Amino acid sequence: MATLTSSICSKPKASVFDPHKSSFHGVPIATQARLSPVKSTPVNLAVTAAAMPYDLRSFKFEPIKESIVSREMTRRYMMDMITYADTDVVVVGAGSAGLSCAYELSKNPSVQVAIIEQSVSPGGGAWLGGQLFSSMVVRKPAHRFLDELGLEYDEQDNYVVIKHAALFTSTIMSKLLARPNVKLFNAVAAEDLIIKEGKVGGVVTNWALVSMNHDTQSCMDPNVMEAKVVVSSCGHDGPFGATGVKRLRSVGMIDSVPGMKALDMNTAEDEIVRLTREVVPGMIVTGMEVAEIDGSPRMGPTFGAMMISGQKAAHLALKSLGLPNALDGTYIGNLHPELVLAAAADAAEIAEA
């Protein structure tokens, strides 16, 4: 049985990607330290330039044929499309929930993960905090996930603050996309679902710009990507939001998508994690899309639920794949139940929600 490391374990084993670092050895910084100005160290440009192995005044790149650049990009992308045409898990939406899900899933090197993101820039709304401010507020105990990523933060009694939300998003993306079992297909939209015999079996894809212009162009047929599990993390309602659950409603697999209620942070974050689940066979819903399908309150500019909902979705996917996971006791390690289910009721209540 494989041993994996997760921030939802109280005594994590060594990570398969960083055997010298525990998930719990983060680097929280006291608030007062943050308020002290940081002075840069003067750099001696003369010494630096002298140590360089080349002369910047006559710098030249190695020559290359333009066709080689084209072939390298095309060949590698086509190989990725072939490789991930039939994959283990497709995560639709690369916001904070989708990225957290893919990060947790891909710790198991045997699980092949494709991420579909309609935007050129992944990250969803997690590049900034509320109202375009910089800081990201994360309520405890989700700070354990930040510890695992090695992120610095200012620690308060019940929450922590990252000085810029982009630090979280850029850090998790750099760690995630370096893994050999992960491929991000950005600027690609999931236009539809593959559904066979009452089970979701993949997604229908197209270039995002094509999807946005179907009414102005002639028919441009899509492509497909089969998957054993689809994780829908498309966010709240919008042109490309909540598309997974809206499609389930339109084909009659669920009854309604009532939409999220007015803001209530304390209720919202617990509910989003608790209600993260497999809504129909083959499809798990995570992040703010959960609020759309269940009529939960919106949570506003706090991000802990996105991270832990994504982690929970990952373990639901692992369970569906028959692999060790934190939900059925097969995962190695002592669990922090609050990080798996938050304010969780029993499985029957979640299934009926």
From Swiss-Prot:
Keyword Oxidoreductase attributed: no
Co-factor note (free text): Binds 1 Fe cation per subunit.
Name of this protein: Thiamine thiazole synthase 1, chloroplastic
Classification via Gene3D superfamilies: 6.10.250.2840, FAD/NAD(P)-binding domain
GO annotation terms (biological process): thiamine biosynthetic process; thiazole biosynthetic process
Membrane-spanning ranges: none
Recorded GO CC terms: chloroplast stroma; cytosol
Subcellular locations according to the entry: Plastid, Chloroplast
Cofactor requirements of the protein: Fe cation
